[in-house]
Amino acid sequence: MVHRLPVFKRYMGNTPQKKAVFGQCRGLPCVAPLLTTVEEAPRGISARVRGHFPKWLNGSLLRTGPGKFEFGKDKYNHWFDGMALLHQFRMAKGTVTYRSKFLQSDTYKANSAKNRIVISEFGTLALPDPCKNVFERFMSRFELPGKAAAMTDNTNVNYVRYKGDYYLCTETNFMNKVDIETLEKTEKVDWSKFIAVNGATAHPHYDPDGTAYNMGNSFGPYGFSYKVIRVPPEKVDLGETIHGAQVICSIASTEKGKPSYYHSFGMTRNYIIFIEQPLKMNLWKIATSKIRGKAFSDGISWEPQCNTWFHVVDKRTGQLLPGRYYSKPFVTFHQINAFEDQGCVIIDLCCQDNGRTLEVYQLQNLRKAGEGLDQVYNSAAKSFPRRFVLPLNVSLNAPEGDNLSPLSYTSASAVKQADGTIWCSHENLHQEDLEKEGGIEFPQIYYDQFSGKKYHFFYGCGFRHLVGGDSLIKVDVVNKTLKVWREDGFYPSEPVFVPAPGTNEEDGGVILSVVITPNQNESNFLLVLDAKNFGELGRAEVPVQMPYGFHGTFIPI
């Protein structure tokens, strides 16, 4: 059943919903050099340090993202399609060394051997082998897109940790285990060999003991369902990977033939929060994509006539809670944090009111210049932090129209409807100054100490450009204030918080970010900021071309 957006004028008095107004940007600089193929730098390069890196900051910042966008005459169409390039910034007693390597995935090796695109990616359909005859090329179109031999293992999105080992992942069945010292692939792991899922997100969550949780999906005789996955924290045998993984809950898709696309989920101490949003995957289009000569991305569409639903799962029992929470249509790619208070789950998200972002990230759009680039940017949805409240214990006797949230510190509301559902209106966690920064994405917190707990700060990238924006931002979610770092002509990556030894303060440490530029006469660098005042402590300059990447992690020595 498709639930259409209702109007609740009588409830809006207590929960003002301000509409963001954005200025039109003009004269955006071309960033095409940040989205072109680069050479790997497998031998360590000593960086030139300006300022200083704290002596206690010892370890490696690992990042990944696309770094090769063509093979022979074949070119990728979408930013997400590029071959995974692994980056390592190694810090030791104030010195910094950089290296990079292309992930030797089966996809990378197959494409390299044929010097063409052999395996399809998110936005690029691999063409039939020109060496085959006409009949063979025709029949090759009838291979199912999920067939293991034809599915990409180009895991270019994030580093994740299971049982103490690190894996590169995307959103398919496959992960690639890597040696974090050498950046070499050591093993390919298929989720479907352990549990009945067709993939998992690149953003798992972790309990303090190392137990990992993730979201996957599967399609069976009863339709499409979303799966909550749990992976134990420790190995029984040394050679294990994700052995012991379990599906602890299945959530039926609201619309069987068109489930939601999702990139992440929320977690508190006791609950998993899954957001079913109206960014839909048309299963028929995806299943027939190769026959129709279309890429996987052709099967994803924004359907704003549908609302966004919140599903809450008890981590201990695996039970889906009976509460039915929904809101106006929005899209979220990254959750900020979630916690419990006074019988409610509070979840903070980076939200967009338009779900066409995936279309914007076609490489032909990102590489534009002049008015064409301005038009693409001005038409793109901007992402802003919002808070939602989900009351867990809803009385059947609660009157229709009551706001069930008991929380005095947030204007987010949860209003009971006549049919027992709960309409959730958000609180904006920002003022107008964040609109001037183009919104925010790639949110990060002091995860080890504050994930699943009430918190004060998060860090992210401002988006006054299509790729990476031009700033790093510290957001105070209590006072709704910002601290901003910016340098003209440079584009910082996702900020990574590293705590100082012995600290329990949310901002008691430093922020690391890889900052790159399209200007050939300038060096890219690793930036270190004081997380409290957001002032620069130092930078480590590397005379190597780097593309803009996605996610990463810091691993202390």
Curated annotation (Swiss-Prot):
Per its UniProt record, the required cofactor names are: Fe(2+)
The domain of life is Eukaryota
Specify whether Ribosomal protein is a keyword of the entry.
Answer: no
UniProt: Fe cation binding residues: 203, 263, 334, 551
EC nos: 1.13.11.-, 1.13.11.71
Q: Where in the cell is it found?
A: Mitochondrion
Q: Which UniProt keywords apply?
A: Dioxygenase, Iron, Lipid metabolism, Metal-binding, Mitochondrion, Oxidoreductase
Q: What is its main location?
A: mitochondrion
GO BP terms in the entry: carotene catabolic process; lutein catabolic process; lycopene catabolic process; retinal metabolic process; xanthophyll catabolic process; zeaxanthin catabolic process
Q: How is the cofactor bound?
A: Binds 1 Fe(2+) ion per subunit.
For this UniProt entry, what's an example GO CC term? mitochondrion
Q: Which InterPro entries match?
A: Carotenoid_Oase (IPR004294)
What GO annotations for molecular function exist for this entry? Answer: 9,10 (9', 10')-carotenoid-cleaving dioxygenase activity; beta,beta-carotene-9',10'-cleaving oxygenase activity; beta-carotene 15,15'-dioxygenase activity; metal ion binding
Reaction(s) this enzyme catalyzes, per UniProt: all-trans-beta-carotene + O2 = beta-ionone + all-trans-10'-apo-beta-carotenal; 5-cis-lycopene + O2 = 5-cis-10'-apo-lycopenal + (3E,5E)-6,10-dimethylundeca-3,5,9-trien-2-one; 13-cis-lycopene + O2 = 13-cis-10'-apo-lycopenal + (3E,5E)-6,10-dimethylundeca-3,5,9-trien-2-one; lutein + O2 = (3R,6R)-hydroxy-alpha-ionone + (3R)-3-hydroxy-10'-apo-beta-carotenal
Relate the protein's function as given in its record. Answer: Broad specificity mitochondrial dioxygenase that mediates the asymmetric oxidative cleavage of carotenoids. Cleaves carotenes (pure hydrocarbon carotenoids) such as all-trans-beta-carotene and lycopene as well as xanthophylls (oxygenated carotenoids) such as zeaxanthin, lutein and beta-cryptoxanthin at both the 9,10 and the 9',10' carbon-carbon double bond. Through its function in carotenoids metabolism regulates oxidative stress and the production of important signaling molecules.
Family of the protein in this entry = Belongs to the carotenoid oxygenase family.
**By its UniProt entry, which PANTHER family does this protein fall under?**
BETA-CAROTENE DIOXYGENASE, CAROTENOID-CLEAVING DIOXYGENASE, MITOCHONDRIAL
Protein name in UniProt: Carotenoid-cleaving dioxygenase, mitochondrial
Organism (species): Pongo abelii
Q: What is the lineage of its organism?
A: Eukaryota, Metazoa, Chordata, Craniata, Vertebrata
Gene symbol? Answer: BCO2
